Amino acid sequence: MGKHRRNNSNATRKAVAASAVALGATAAIASPAQAAEVVVPGTGISVDIAGIETTPGLNNVPGIDQWIPSLSSQAAPTAYAAVIDAPAAEAQAAPAASTGQAIVDAARTKIGSPYGWGATGPNAFDCSGLTSWAYSQVGKSIPRTSQAQAAQGTPVAYSDLQAGDIVAFYSGATHVGIYSGHGTVIHALNSSTPLSEHSLDYMPFHSAVRF
């Protein structure tokens, strides 16, 4: 009986080693090294194989860490950093985008409100009164007049407009509105036109800024 058990043990070790090779250890095992535990998932069978961790390309085999648990601590730092850092970069960009959209959303609630010279809301607005009011809804303070807004913000190219940017129109930046995305602007034009949303082409473009 003792001899029979030894034969079974040898057969098991050979089967486990063959399974590890089938997962991707196709190259010859490197020079003698510290033995690593190789596990056959779901069987409770394991065996120590010297030098298997040094097999070229072994780390690239999908799921190899389930067979050789010690490899789970050897993940490539660059790949790990890419997975961890990518969401962080997106998270950093999110506040600016959400703030711009919040400005647009605030302005959009006032569509249909009457124009009033010098009015800053909440029931009537002139052009720069609307932009100032919408920005104040997200905690931002900007200059009061259209010319000052156009002069003091960070210049933005027409092709780089984002929701919430302030767009100036006409010579001298005498009129401003809030870029609402998709080529449109929300603005308070004049006493004969209630606060509305129009195409950017509705008026001659002067410049655009971002605060």
Swiss-Prot record:
The keyword Electron transport does not apply. The keyword Secreted applies. Keywords: Hydrolase, Protease, Secreted, Signal, Thiol protease. The active site is at C127, H175, H187. GO terms for molecular function: cysteine-type peptidase activity. Residues 1-35 form the signal peptide. Its EC number is 3.4.-.-. It is found in: Secreted. It comes from the Bacteria. GO terms for biological process: proteolysis. InterPro entries: NLP_P60_dom (IPR000064), Papain-like_cys_pep_sf (IPR038765), PG_Endopeptidase_C40 (IPR051794). Residues 97-211 form the NlpC/P60 domain. Pfam families: NLPC_P60. GO terms for cellular component: extracellular region. Belongs to the peptidase C40 family. This is Probable endopeptidase cgR_2070. It comes from Corynebacterium glutamicum (strain R).
